[in-house]
């Protein structure tokens, strides 16, 4: 059904780290009242027989300065990738399902949006999806195109969409501003290089999303500022992260809160090696995670080394973390490994209680890290390099809790050799928390 009512209220966010409003400046209903460009009127077919690429481009050209591009319910074949560039005040309503043509092996981006503002990409039935059939690349240890990439976009939202089996990254937000992403499911194979949501830019609110993949769940990259991420369900994923970071890093005012991570690579990892620049004023609060390889991990010796003595990490807090690692003896649940030549300062750990699924003790590792909590050293005078490992044998009382489960846990890896089914979007993404926005299908 074509949108006929106000579908997106400009959010008033109380989050401290987001500066001002995010999302489109005008509603999709207002855009639709100005003009509707239905792809069926431009030669598209809803039975997956004709390439939707050219009709989608033509529809966009007619609506790019004000209007709504409409893809009704049905199945659509995408054989030629689409670039939607320039314009402002437009929306893309995807109520059908777009399928990548299995015979097309081009890289790049299936849908690329650039140099535009005041836009909304959404599904009015909360069932709009893009199926990338990435397994046809992955079974040969290869990668293909990203599903959706936004570059230099301002005042936008992406919501009520399902992205499935991407041949590479799923949703890539590059140096964009004032963006909101919510009510989404991303589901891909258990393979590296399949990032869920990648962010760089400023003033984002990412909330109420579920990600299954083999690499980052939601990750912040440089440069980034004023980003709030909350109510995220990393369901058999790589887990949330920051990085990898290198030279000229510039990240500040980042908040992650209410993050549930199950059977993933990490609960949260900040990763760099060498490099320079700063990461400052970051908060990671209310994390629950079970059966993850890494847990709380700030590792400045990760991956290939960049030029420089190390990034300066300061004013970073971790608060109210609960859960278990798959093997807390093999990989310490708490690892804060900072550059010897540039120690971390003002790092705080508060109510961080992590245990192990395997064994009867865990390790904690800190090096050149100063602040309060666990194995951190207090800042008293000279910030000398150090390395310290301690063993914990007492089980934290709140590390296990029968009330902290989520429905639909995925315990086995998504295969890289078979097609992945299209899931549905849930209404909750963190235990006890309802989504901020009602699904479009329920409005």
From Swiss-Prot:
Provide the transmembrane region boundaries.
Answer: none
Signal peptide as annotated in the record: 1-16
A GO molecular function assigned to this protein is:
polygalacturonase activity
Keyword set, alphabetical order: Carbohydrate metabolism, Cell wall biogenesis/degradation, Disulfide bond, Glycoprotein, Glycosidase, Hydrolase, Polysaccharide degradation, Secreted, Signal
| Disulfide bond residue pairs | 37-63, 217-234, 338-344, 366-375
Name the enzyme group at the top EC level: hydrolase
Decide whether keyword Cell wall biogenesis/degradation is in the record: yes
Q: What is its EC number?
A: 3.2.1.-
> Where is this protein found?
Secreted
Pfam families per UniProt: Glyco_hydro_28
As for family, the record states: Belongs to the glycosyl hydrolase 28 family.
Q: What is the name of the protein in this document?
A: Putative rhamnogalacturonase D
Q: Which organism is it from?
A: Aspergillus niger (strain ATCC MYA-4892 / CBS 513.88 / FGSC A1513)
């Amino acid at each position: 059904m074509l949108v006929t009512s106000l579908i997106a209220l400009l959010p008033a966010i109380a989050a401290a780290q987001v500066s001002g409003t995010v999302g489109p400046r005008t509603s999709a209903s207002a855009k639709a009242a100005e003009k509707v460009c239905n792809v069926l009127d431009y030669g598209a077919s809803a039975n997956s027989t004709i390439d939707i690429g050219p009709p989608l481009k033509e529809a966009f050209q007619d609506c790019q300065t004000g209007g709504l591009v409409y893809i009704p319910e049905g199945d659509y074949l995408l054989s030629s990738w689409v670039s939607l560039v320039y314009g402002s005040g437009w929306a893309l309503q995807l109520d059908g399902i777009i399928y990548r043509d299995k015979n097309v092996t081009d890289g790049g981006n299936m849908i690329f949006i650039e140099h535009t503002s005041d836009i909304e990409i959404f599904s009015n039935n909360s069932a709009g999806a893009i199926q990338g059939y990435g397994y046809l690349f992955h079974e040969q240890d290869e990668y293909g195109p990203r599903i959706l990439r936004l570059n230099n976009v301002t005042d936008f939202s992406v919501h009520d969409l399902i992205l499935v089996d991407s041949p590479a990254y799923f949703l890539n937000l590059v140096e964009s501003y004032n963006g909101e992403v919510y009510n989404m499911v991303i589901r891909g194979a258990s393979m590296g290089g399949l990032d869920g949501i990648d962010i760089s830019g400023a003033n984002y609110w990412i909330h109420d999303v579920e990600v299954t993949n083999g690499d980052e769940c939601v990750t912040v990259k440089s440069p980034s500022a004023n980003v709030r991420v909350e109510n995220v369900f990393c369901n058999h994923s790589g887990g949330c992260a920051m990085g990898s970071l290198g030279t000229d890093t510039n990240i500040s005012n980042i908040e992650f809160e209410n993050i549930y991570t199950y059977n993933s690579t990490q609960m949260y990892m900040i990763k760099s090696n060498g490099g320079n620049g700063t990461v400052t004023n970051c908060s990671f609060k209310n994390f629950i995670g079970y059966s993850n390889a890494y847990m709380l991990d700030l590792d400045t010796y990760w991956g290939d080394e960049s030029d420089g003595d190390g990034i300066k990490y300061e004013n970073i807090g971790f608060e109210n973390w609960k859960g278990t690692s798959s093997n807390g003896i093999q990989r310490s649940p708490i690892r804060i490994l900072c550059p010897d030549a540039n120690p971390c300062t003002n790092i705080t750990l508060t109510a961080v209680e992590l245990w192990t699924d395997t064994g009867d003790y865990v390790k904690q590792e800190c090096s050149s890290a100063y602040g309060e909590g666990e194995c951190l050293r207090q800042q008293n005078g000279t910030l000398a390099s150090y390395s310290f490992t301690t063993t914990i044998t007492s089980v934290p009382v709140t590390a296990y809790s029968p009330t902290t489960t989520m429905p639909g846990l995925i315990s086995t890896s998504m295969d890289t050799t078979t097609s992945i089914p299209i899931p549905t979007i849930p209404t909750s993404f963190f235990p006890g928390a309802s989504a901020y926005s009602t699904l479009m299908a329920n409005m």
